[in-house]
């Protein structure tokens, strides 16, 4: 059952990233009523939404009712921090999530369910839309940031006057 309903947890996280909830809480931890106003959350589902994020350990709720990011969430899902890796989650939410909804059709027909459906070039579709391209580039840069930081710290740069950053989308290295 847990696996069959796992999309509930996934979509809860993806919606929180989309709304920039973690970025807002990094600036100002708050109680439910304050978050409803600041984030535009409807009273009907706000508490359940936030408490689901607490149960999944993305948020903490103190005895005073104040919601705040966990240390990991604060580090990786606050859009204002250079350590933000949520770009891949933004792309998963906007671009990939819907494709997975067509998995049964893909398995039965063998047809791609993404932009390559019908023989089209998926990258041509991404490059044709500036907003989708920015999202894709942010996703690729964010997901490679940890490795880039390690390379930057460990590579013996002293013997080189220039280099080309070819695989990290936005020149993150």
Residue spans of the language-model regions?
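Conserved Class I S-adenosyl-L-methionine-dependent methyltransferase catalytic core
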Residues: 1-162
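Conserved beta-strand/loop positions that form the S-adenosyl-L-methionine
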Residues: 166
């Amino acid at each position: 059952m847990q696996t069959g309903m796992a999309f509930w947890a996934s979509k809860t996280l993806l919606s929180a990233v989309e709304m920039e909830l973690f970025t807002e809480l990094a600036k100002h931890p708050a109680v439910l009523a304050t978050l409803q106003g600041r984030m535009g959350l409807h009273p009907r589902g706000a508490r359940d939404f936030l408490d689901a994020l607490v149960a999944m350990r993305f948020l903490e709720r103190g005895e005073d009712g104040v919601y705040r990011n966990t240390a990991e969430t604060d580090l990786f899902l606050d859009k204002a921090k250079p350590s933000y890796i949520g770009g891949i989650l933004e792309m998963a939410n906007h671009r990939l999530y819907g494709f997975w909804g067509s998995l049964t059709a893909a398995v039965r027909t063998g047809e791609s369910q993404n932009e390559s459906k019908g023989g089209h070039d998926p990258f041509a579709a991404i490059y044709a839309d500036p907003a989708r391209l920015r999202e894709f580039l942010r996703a690729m840069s964010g997901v490679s940031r940890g490795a880039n930081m390690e390379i930057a710290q460990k590579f013996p740069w002293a013997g080189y006057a220039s280099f080309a950053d070819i695989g990290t989308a936005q020149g993150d290295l």
